C-alpha cells in the first residue's frame, strides 16, 4: 500500500486561558481531536490556591463530548483534588481523582478513583528523591484494586 504525502489523519487543536494571581491561579482549556469522521471536544477548568501557612490546594475538572459515539456513551469526565505543603526538610502531598478519563456506559459514567501520597526531599543540591504510594480502584466491583509503590529520583546539574 502506497502512502500519500499529505494523507488525512488525526488533527488536534486547543486553546488555554490562564490567570496567575500570585497565591492563586485558574485556567480554562478547550481542545478538539478530529479523526476524519469523529470529533471529540474537551473542556477543562483547573485551579490552585496557596494558603499563607504554606499549604497549597489544587483541583481540576474535565468534561468531554465524544463525537460519533452512541447517545448513551458520548461523554467523558475526569477530576482531581490535591493538597501539598512543606513538612520537615521536604514536601508532603496527597491527591484523589479519577484514574484517567472516565467514559459514559449505558447512560451513566462509572467512577474509577485513584489515591496517591508522596514525600519529596532534597538529598543534596543536585538530587531530589520522591517516594510515592498509590491505590487505583478496580474498574468494576469484581475487579481487584491495584496498589503500587515507587521512588522517583531527579538529578540536576
Say what each PLM segment does:
Residues 102-105, 127, 137-142:
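Short active-site-adjacent structural elements
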Residues 60, 95, 119, 127-129:
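Long, contiguous hydrophobic alpha-helical segments, chiefly transmembrane helices and signal peptides
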Residues 2-11, 36, 67-70, 137-145:
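Surface-exposed loop and membrane-interface regions of Gram-negative outer-membrane beta-barrel proteins
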Residues 10-114:
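Detector for outer-membrane/organellar transmembrane beta-barrel domains
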Residues 1-3, 125, 130:
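Compact, aliphatic and Gly/Pro-tolerant "microcore" segments centered on a short helix or tight beta-hairpin
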Amino acid at each position: 500500500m502506497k502512502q500519500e504525502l499529505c494523507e488525512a489523519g488525526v488533527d488536534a487543536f486547543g486553546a488555554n486561558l490562564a490567570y496567575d494571581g500570585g497565591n492563586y491561579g485558574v485556567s480554562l482549556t478547550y481542545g478538539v481531536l478530529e479523526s476524519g469522521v469523529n470529533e471529540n471536544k474537551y473542556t477543562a477548568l483547573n485551579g490552585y490556591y496557596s494558603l499563607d501557612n504554606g499549604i497549597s490546594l489544587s483541583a481540576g475538572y474535565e468534561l468531554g463530548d465524544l463525537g460519533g459515539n452512541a447517545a448513551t456513551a458520548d461523554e467523558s469526565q475526569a477530576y482531581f483534588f490535591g493538597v501539598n505543603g512543606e513538612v520537615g526538610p521536604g514536601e508532603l502531598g496527597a491527591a484523589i481523582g479519577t484514574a484517567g478519563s472516565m467514559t459514559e456506559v449505558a447512560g451513566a459514567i462509572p467512577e474509577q478513583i485513584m489515591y496517591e501520597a508522596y514525600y519529596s526531599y532534597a538529598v543534596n543540591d543536585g538530587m531530589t528523591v520522591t517516594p510515592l504510594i498509590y491505590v487505583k480502584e478496580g474498574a468494576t466491583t469484581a475487579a481487584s484494586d491495584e496498589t503500587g509503590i515507587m521512588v522517583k529520583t531527579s538529578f540536576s546539574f
